[in-house]
Amino acid sequence: AASPADRSVVGGGERAAEWLDSARVLIGNYFRMENPSFLEPAARESFVNARLPSGLAIRGIIDRVDRAPDGALRIVDYKTGKSPNPRFQEEALFQMRFYAAAVRLSRGVLPRRTQLIYLKDGRTLTYDPVPGDVAAIASELDSTWSAIEERLDSRRFEPRPSKLCDWCRFKELCPEFGGVAPDMDASGARALRTAKEPAGPS
């Protein structure tokens, strides 16, 4: 049965029962994929905080970090959804390259392997990073940040509707759905800009 804490999140009755059923599937798949008694992670829920050469801060939380006897690192992240269709794996590959770059920039070591474990369908997506990934990710993130800065300057943020809109907590404020976006707070914009600092001497 769901605990009081669980019920406060998922509700009671049928909703709680559905949530527990879905959780059982995920847990069952996990134990079919891995035997935790054989795992000795070097870290769990590991926070990484790094800066790109441009000075842009990047952060993330890695579910599991494994260290081989020779010191090589493996980055593992768990997903509760299904694995992506091969035609749509680019976003997943981006995440793995992002983690690899963040670890390389913050710890000086490029992970030998990154893995996304999809518990819903019991599949694992594996990618072995290469040194060029760090520069590629840095370039992509810098480009994204430049686009954000342009919109901060113009105070125009064009809606980009997609199927993910149903999950957005700000949907009711979005002009795309008949909402009225609030005025941009100047102090918030200034705070956002602090994500990038001038690069230090090399």
Predicted regions and their residues:
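A short linear-motif detector with a strong N-terminal bias
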Residues: D21-V25, A42-E45, P53, L93-R97, ...
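Short helix-to-loop capping/linker segments positioned immediately adjacent to catalytic or ligand/cofactor-binding
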Residues: V10, E14, P84-R87, L105, ...
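Mg2+/Mn2+-dependent nuclease catalytic core
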Residues: S46-I137
